[in-house]
C-alpha cells in the first residue's frame, strides 16, 4: 500500500501529557492518580498514551469497553486495566482470558460474576449522577457479599462547578465506605481533584486534563496543551468584493479577498460550529475561517498573510477551553471528535 502524506496533521506533545499526569498526581495528595484512556484516549491514541503514562509511573488505566482493554493489554499488566461499562454474559470467556478487571454496575452483573468464578472486581456506586452503578440500599443490603471487591468507585456529576451536589455526593460516598469490604475507594475525575483532599480517597481518575483540557478554573496555571492541528493549503484564489464564499453563501467578502482553502472539515471533527468563528494562523498572522465549514474543506481569509501559497501548512487554532467557549462545544467533544484522517505525530 502506498504511504501517502495526509494533508492534515495532529501534533501530540508527549512531554506535556506526562507533565499533566504528574501535576494531577501531585495534586491528588496521598491518593495516586490513574488515567482514563477510554475512547482511544479521548481521540489521541490509547496505545501511545498508555506507554508514556506507564513509563511515567501510572498504574491504573480506565477504559469503557472490553475491546479497548484488549487493545492495550500487551502494553501493561492486564490487572492494571479497569473496564467501566461492566460485563455481559457474552463477554465472560473473553474477560477471563484477558484478565482486565470489570467494574460491576448492576445486581445482575454481580450475580453473573459470582456464578462464573468470581475473583477480583471493582464496583460502581451511584452517588447521584443516575447513570451506572448500585444504589446505597443495594450495597447496604449486602449485595456485595462474597465478592472480592478491590475498588469501589463513584463519579462526580458537577465537579467543574461549585454546587451543593458535590458535597452531597461526597457525603453519600463517605457513608457507603463502612458498608463494604472494598480495599480502595475512588471518586474524583480531573475537576474533582481540585475540590480538595476530602474528595481524593485512594485513587483519582483524571481524563480530560491529561490531554490539555481545563476541567476547572485555575487549572490553566499547570495544565499544558497536548494537541495542535495543522492543515495543508490546497488552493488560493482572489475573490472580488461582494462575492460569496461557501455553502449557502453565508459569507460575503466585504472587500477583495485572498481566499485559501485548507484540507480539514467536519468529517475530521472540525465541526460546523467553527463556521465564521474558527481561527487559523500563519506564524503570528491571523487567517480567520470565513463561510461554512464543509465535510473536507474550510475557507480562510488570507489577506493578512499575502506570502501564503498552495502547499503551505496552516496552524488551526484548537485551544480547548477557548474554543469550547467560542463554539459552544464541550472540551470533551473537541477531543473525541478528532477523526482518523489526521496523521497523528507524537513529539
Residue spans of the language-model regions?
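Active-site anion/phosphate-binding pocket segments in diverse small-molecule metabolic enzymes
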Residues: 2-14, 18-21, 68, 87-89, ...
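Active-site-proximal beta-alpha core segment in soluble small-molecule metabolic enzymes
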Residues: 3-4, 8-19, 26-176, 181-186, ...
Amino acid at each position: 500500500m502506498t504511504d501517502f502524506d495526509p494533508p492534515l496533521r495532529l501534533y501530540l506533545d508527549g512531554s506535556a501529557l506526562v507533565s499533566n499526569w504528574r501535576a494531577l498526581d501531585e495534586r491528588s495528595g496521598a491518593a495516586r492518580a490513574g488515567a482514563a484512556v477510554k475512547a482511544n484516549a479521548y481521540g489521541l491514541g490509547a496505545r501511545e498514551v498508555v506507554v508514556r503514562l506507564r513509563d511515567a509511573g501510572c498504574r491504573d488505566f480506565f477504559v469503557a469497553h472490553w475491546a479497548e482493554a484488549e487493545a492495550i493489554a500487551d502494553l501493561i499488566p492486564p490487572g492494571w486495566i479497569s473496564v467501566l461499562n461492566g460485563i455481559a454474559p457474552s463477554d465472560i470467556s473473553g474477560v477471563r482470558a484477558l484478565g482486565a478487571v470489570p467494574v460491576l454496575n448492576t445486581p445482575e452483573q454481580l450475580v453473573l460474576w459470582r456464578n462464573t468464578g468470581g475473583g477480583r472486581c471493582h464496583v460502581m456506586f451511584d452517588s447521584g449522577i443516575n447513570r451506572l452503578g448500585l444504589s446505597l440500599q443495594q450495597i447496604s443490603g449486602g449485595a456485595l457479599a462474597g465478592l472480592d471487591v478491590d475498588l469501589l468507585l463513584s463519579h462526580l456529576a458537577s465537579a467543574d462547578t461549585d454546587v451543593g451536589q458535590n458535597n452531597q455526593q461526597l457525603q453519600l460516598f463517605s457513608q457507603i465506605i463502612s458498608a463494604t469490604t472494598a480495599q480502595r475507594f475512588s471518586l474524583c475525575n480531573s475537576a474533582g481533584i481540585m475540590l480538595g483532599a476530602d474528595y481524593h480517597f485512594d485513587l483519582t481518575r483524571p481524563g480530560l486534563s491529561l490531554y490539555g483540557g481545563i476541567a476547572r478554573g485555575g487549572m490553566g496555571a499547570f495544565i499544558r496543551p497536548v494537541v495542535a492541528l495543522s492543515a495543508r493549503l490546497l488552493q488560493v484564489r482572489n475573490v472580488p468584493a461582494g462575492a460569496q464564499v461557501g455553502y449557502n453563501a453565508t459569507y460575503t467578502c466585504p472587500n477583495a479577498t485572498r481566499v485559501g482553502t485548507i484540507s480539514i472539515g467536519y468529517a475530521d471533527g472540525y465541526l460546523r460550529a467553527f463556521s465564521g468563528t474558527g481561527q487559523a494562523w500563519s506564524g503570528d498572522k491571523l487567517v480567520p475561517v470565513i463561510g461554512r465549514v464543509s465535510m473536507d474543506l474550510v475557507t480562510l481569509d488570507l489577506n493578512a498573510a499575502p506570502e501564503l501559497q498552495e502547499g503551505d501548512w496552516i496552524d488551526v487554532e484548537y485551544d480547548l477551553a477557548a474554543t469550547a467557549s467560542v463554539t459552544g462545544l464541550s472540551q470533551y467533544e473537541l477531543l473525541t471528535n478528532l477523526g482518523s484522517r489526521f496523521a497523528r505525530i507524537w513529539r
